[in-house]
């Protein structure tokens, strides 16, 4: 099934909304701006399903995108694969918040996801990706995801995620040398400065090979990666990372603006942006960690001239580390 979504927003109005099964959508009012709520209108994602999502925000407009339920990549038992392709243009001064429910990679799935974000001057985006590795008692299938972000035509973030079904064990006994995450996760290169800067970060899956059994909320704590931006899957970020027993993974990006406060598990990009990583054994644990930081990202994204209150940042630190 080839389905999808096309959205055009001008100011606070959704002026174009076109959907094709298995996607349906409804426009709702929201405090952030209009909310496009995505609803499943048919079974999916099944083998052969390909979804194309196109979002266009006019200068100064705002949009929030949510889903009513998790997106499930079902087993591709007879071959084939599933795919979701998202392409967003965020005009000058416009604001986009992409906040879907988790993506669940079932056993036997083969899924490819590609996201391209094009930000004009002054545009800001909060982008959330949450991944659940298999249903209860399952080993996740294969998931390949790619995120490419450009700000004013120059690269801001390049990130890849590859989860191999046979090589990933998310059961309770998983430990050591788990080649769960591989691929580039890089910032730059067009913006001056190192690709990633900052001290060692706990709670962030650092790409590389290690033999360890991670504790809750921590994959690998390692030193900051400094130097010019990295291009290509073999230039320093090509090794496997340890996910271990964590079945729930989230990436939260603030793009077009940096967080002014230190947030656990977050890294500043070379350009204007902050990215945060979270791992958890349970879905509610991950939701709590993300929920402690997401409002701060939305606040900065919504009103970049309003400084982030200190106590809010402190509460985020406490929640992430509990």
What are these model-predicted stretches?
Residues 106-114, 119-144:
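Acidic (Asp/Glu-rich), glycine- and aromatic
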Residues 179-234:
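Long, intrinsically disordered low-complexity tandem-repeat segments
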Residues 87-102, 106-117, 306-314, 318-322:
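Well-ordered alpha/beta subsegment
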Residues 61, 94, 109, 122-124, ...:
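Small-residue (G/S/T/A) turn/hinge positions that recur once per unit in extracellular repeat modules
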Residues 1-102, 107, 292-296:
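N-terminal, charged/glycine-rich beta-strand/loop interface patches
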Residues 57-59, 67-69, 90-92, 100-102, ...:
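Short, structured patches in soluble enzyme cores that scaffold and shape functional sites
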Residues 129-176, 231-322:
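A structural signal for small-residue-enriched, beta-sheet-centric alpha/beta enzyme cores
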Residues 53-55, 85-88, 113-117, 145-147:
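Hydrophobic/aromatic beta-strand elements that line small-molecule binding cavities or substrate pockets
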């Amino acid at each position: 099934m080839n389905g999808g979504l096309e959205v055009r927003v001008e100011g606070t109005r959704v002026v174009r909304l076109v959907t094709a099964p298995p996607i349906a959508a409804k426009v709702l009012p929201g405090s952030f701006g209009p909310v496009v709520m995505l609803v499943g209108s048919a079974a999916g994602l099944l083998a052969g399903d390909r979804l194309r999502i196109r979002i266009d925000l006019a200068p100064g407009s705002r949009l929030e995108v949510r889903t009513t339920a998790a997106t499930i990549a079902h087993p591709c038992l007879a071959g084939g694969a599933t795919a979701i392709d998202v392409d967003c243009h965020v005009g000058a001064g416009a604001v986009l918040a992409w906040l879907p429910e988790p993506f669940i990679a079932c056993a036997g799935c083969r899924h490819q996801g590609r996201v391209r974000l094009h930000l004009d001057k002054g545009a800001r985006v909060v982008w959330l990706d949450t991944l659940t590795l298999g249903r209860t008692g399952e080993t996740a299938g294969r998931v390949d995801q790619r995120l490419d972000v450009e700000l004013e035509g120059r690269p801001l973030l390049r990130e890849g995620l590859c989860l191999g079904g046979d090589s990933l064990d998310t059961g309770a006994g998983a430990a050591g040398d788990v080649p769960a995450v591989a691929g580039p996760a890089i910032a730059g290169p067009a913006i001056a400065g190192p690709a990633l800067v900052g001290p060692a970060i706990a709670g962030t899956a650092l790409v590389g090979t290690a033999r360890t059994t991670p504790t809750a909320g921590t994959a690998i704590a390692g030193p900051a990666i400094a130097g010019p931006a990295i291009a290509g899957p073999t230039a320093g970020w090509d090794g496997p990372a340890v996910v271990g027993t964590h079945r729930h993974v989230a990436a939260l990006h603030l793009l077009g603006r940096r967080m002014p406060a230190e947030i656990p598990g977050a890294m500043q990009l070379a350009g204007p942006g902050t990215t945060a990583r979270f791992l958890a054994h349970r879905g509610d644990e991950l939701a709590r960690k993300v929920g402690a930081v997401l409002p701060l990202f939305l606040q900065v994204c919504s009103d970049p001239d309003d400084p982030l209150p200190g106590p809010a940042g402190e509460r985020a630190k406490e929640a992430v580390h509990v």
